[in-house]
Structure formats: C-alpha cells, structure tokens
C-alpha cells in the first residue's frame, strides 16, 4: 500500500511549474500503478492550448471554475466543482481559467514520469525513465 501526502510533495521535484499552472505529481510511472495521478492548480484567466497525442487524460474539477474548448467541434464546456472531462480521443483542446483558481485532479494513461514538459503542440512526449 502506498500513502502519499500532498504536504510531502509541495516544494519537491514532484511539484512541477508550467506556463502559469502548477501540478503536484502524486503517483508517477515509477509507482507502477498503470496510471499517474496529479493535482493541478490553474489560475484565473489563464489559458493553454493542449493536445495529449501520446496520453489519455481524465480531469475532475474539485474547486474553482473555468472552461474547456474542444478544438474539433468548437464546443465550450463549463468546468466547476463536480465536473469531469475525459480526453478519450486525444482531443485537441484549450483549457481556460475562469474567475477563481481551479483545482483539478488529473489521471494520465500511460503514466507520466514527472520529467515531461509540454511540446509545441501542447503534448507530453513519452519519456522513459530508469525505474522500469
């Protein structure tokens, strides 16, 4: 059994800062769960175009508000506490912060190693680590 406390992640290499957002990597590939689990903090008004072409992602909003735009259909979906979205088709999208900071619980498959950064498409490359 693994027990991970958020307080033990903050300020370590498992707390990753990106373009305006920060992500706490709770479970990673080396934890051998078959997925990775993150808490992502998204600031009000911030937006980022992404396309996880190498990963599937499910995101559950537990606080704040914002929206996600499906770039294939143009549909915009409001996000707030209790809403989940799943990028089950490697969907190109724009995530936008609303009027309050969003707190998002994210699951990636395949799991990330924690070393990934968004590329020019807004995707994570598949990263191999030494813990396989």
UniProtKB/Swiss-Prot annotation:
<comment type="function">
    <text>Catalyzes the circularization of gamma-N-acetyl-alpha,gamma-diaminobutyric acid (ADABA) to ectoine (1,4,5,6-tetrahydro-2-methyl-4-pyrimidine carboxylic acid), which is an excellent osmoprotectant.</text>
</comment>
<protein>
    <recommendedName>
        <fullName>L-ectoine synthase</fullName>
        <ecNumber>4.2.1.108</ecNumber>
    </recommendedName>
</protein>
<dbReference type="GO" id="GO:0019491">
    <property type="term" value="P:ectoine biosynthetic process"/>
</dbReference>
<comment type="pathway">
    <text>Amine and polyamine biosynthesis; ectoine biosynthesis; L-ectoine from L-aspartate 4-semialdehyde: step 3/3.</text>
</comment>
<comment type="similarity">
    <text>Belongs to the ectoine synthase family.</text>
</comment>
<keyword id="KW-0456">Lyase</keyword>
<dbReference type="InterPro" id="IPR010462">
    <property type="entry name" value="Ectoine_synth"/>
</dbReference>
<dbReference type="Pfam" id="PF06339">
    <property type="entry name" value="Ectoine_synth"/>
</dbReference>
<dbReference type="GO" id="GO:0033990">
    <property type="term" value="F:ectoine synthase activity"/>
</dbReference>
<dbReference type="InterPro" id="IPR014710">
    <property type="entry name" value="RmlC-like_jellyroll"/>
</dbReference>
<dbReference type="InterPro" id="IPR011051">
    <property type="entry name" value="RmlC_Cupin_sf"/>
</dbReference>
């Amino acid at each position: 059994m693994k027990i991970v406390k958020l307080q033990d992640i903050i300020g370590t290499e498992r707390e990753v800062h990106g373009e305006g957002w920060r992500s706490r990597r709770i479970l990673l590939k080396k934890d051998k769960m078959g997925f990775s689990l993150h808490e992502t903090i998204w600031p009000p008004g911030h937006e980022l175009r992404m396309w996880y072409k190498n990963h599937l992602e499910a995101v559950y909003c537990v606080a704040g508000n914002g929206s996600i735009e499906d770039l294939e259909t143009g549909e915009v979906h409001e996000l707030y506490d209790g809403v989940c979205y799943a990028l089950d088709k490697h969907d190109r999208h724009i995530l936008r912060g609303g009027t309050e900071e969003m707190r998002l619980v994210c699951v990636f498959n395949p799991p990330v190693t924690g070393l990934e950064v968004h590329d020019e498409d807004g995707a994570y490359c598949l990263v191999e680590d030494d813990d396989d």
